[in-house]
């Protein structure tokens, strides 16, 4: 751990106006005088006596105590998720906008901090990363963040810690409260040299490009691999998997695959299509090239979709309903909740809305090549079997 005298705790929210700017000026001054930037404490609101308190800061509102409300369960399990988490990290703060651009938590932890926890100290290896980078217009400072997972996130670092928990597979999709997360994540120019504020990059574009700082994405959510390297996972295109994606060991995401924040795979899976926010994919499932799974972030959709084990979404297919285990959707067929489906197995060809079949197992959805009608029939035995050579 780093020494107490080498740094103190200050607030994450350095974007709150005049008080925040004065505080940032003090941080810069302290950095020049001591050779180390001051640290951030989001744990208890106890700011070191050497710091003036930031305007708008209140550690108590950072969700340290869980007061009920949000209590999701792990998919397929009666186990309730942990109520709190904490971590030591490094925050990148823009010097031109006084905004926390990102926070990196290399070893996030579930539960309450240990009894000997001191929020004013961070590990020495993280303290060594503190400093300023004038070429990017940022300073890097340590953060100590403790959060309640049932409460909405309250700050940028709080939001980043939740995304790290998901991508480290410490929590499962939909088990952590992410309400309001978009408002806490600024739009950032994520570059090959780290995060930069878009305004700073636009003003200093030539110098940044000459230094090798090329923009890889301009987004609120960064690429997952900038922060986490999942075990036994293949990701062909770094930019197509966001931080906050939950990728179980054995998952392969090919070039045209996309995984948003807070969906995920629960086992070995092939992803060549799009997995929207909140969608959960079972073990042994293949999301074919260009396939699409409807989400709830836009377009009015309300149902969170899940896909069972050993399912196949054919190339360029799509679903707006959940699938049970061992289901197949024919290539090119999009099945929404309102799609009229003709039931062929064990029936007289009655038409029903596909939504009535949501979550049922052992089904094959196909389009009749003569009439164009969408049909569903029962399948026997297991579903698809993945090629083990394609998975770590």
What is each model feature region?
Residues 233, 239-241, 245-247, 251-253, ...:
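A structural motif detector for beta-strand N-caps
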Residues 339-355:
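A conserved acidic, glycine/proline-rich C-terminal tail/linker
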Residues 2-3, 10, 19-21, 27-29, ...:
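Terminal amphipathic alpha-helical/low-complexity segments used for targeting or macromolecular assembly
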Residues 318-320, 334-336, 341, 370-372:
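Short Gly/Pro-enriched loop/turn and capping motifs at secondary-structure junctions
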Residues 13-14:
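Alpha-helix boundary/capping motif
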């Amino acid at each position: 751990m780093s020494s107490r005298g080498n740094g103190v705790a200050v607030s994450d929210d350095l974007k709150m106006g005049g008080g925040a700017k004065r505080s940032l000026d003090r941080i810069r001054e302290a950095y020049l005088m001591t050779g180390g930037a001051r640290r951030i404490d989001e744990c208890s609101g106890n700011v070191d006596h050497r710091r003036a308190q930031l305007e708008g800061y209140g550690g108590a509102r950072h969700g340290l105590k869980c007061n009920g409300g949000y209590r999701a369960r792990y998919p397929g399990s009666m186990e309730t998720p942990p109520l709190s988490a904490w971590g030591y990290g490094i925050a990148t703060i823009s010097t031109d906008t006084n905004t926390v651009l990102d926070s990196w938590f290399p070893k996030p932890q579930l539960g309450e901090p240990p009894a000997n926890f001191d929020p004013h100290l961070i590990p020495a290896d993280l303290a060594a990363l503190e400093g300023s980078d004038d070429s990017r217009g940022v300073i890097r400072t340590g953060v100590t963040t403790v959060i309640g997972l049932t409460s909405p996130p309250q700050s940028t670092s709080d939001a980043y810690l939740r995304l790290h928990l998901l991508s480290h597979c410490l929590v499962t999709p939909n088990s952590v409260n992410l309400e309001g997360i978009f408002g806490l994540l600024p739009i950032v120019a994520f570059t090959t040299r780290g995060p930069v504020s878009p305004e700073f990059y636009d003003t200093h574009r030539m110098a940044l490009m000459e230094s090798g700082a090329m923009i890889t994405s301009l987004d609120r959510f960064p690429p997952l691999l900038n922060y986490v390297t999942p075990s036994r996972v293949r990701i062909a295109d770094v930019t197509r998997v966001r931080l906050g994606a939950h990728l179980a060991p054995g998952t392969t995401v090919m070039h045209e695959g996309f995984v948003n924040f807070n969906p995920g795979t629960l086992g070995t899976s092939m992803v060549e299509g799009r997995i929207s926010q909140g969608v959960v994919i079972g073990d042994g499932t293949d999301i074919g090239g260009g396939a699409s799974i409807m989400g709830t972030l836009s377009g009015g959709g309300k149902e969170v979709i899940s896909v069972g084990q050993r399912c196949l979404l054919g190339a360029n297919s799509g679903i707006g309903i959940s699938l049970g285990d061992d289901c197949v959707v024919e290539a090119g067929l999009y099945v929404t909740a309102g799609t009229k489906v003709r039931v062929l197995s064990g029936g007289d060809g009655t038409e029903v809305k596909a939504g009535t079949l949501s979550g049922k197992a052992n089904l094959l959805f196909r389009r009749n090549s003569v009439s164009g009608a969408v049909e569903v029939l029962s399948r026997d035995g297991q579903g698809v079997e993945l090629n083990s050579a394609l998975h770590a």
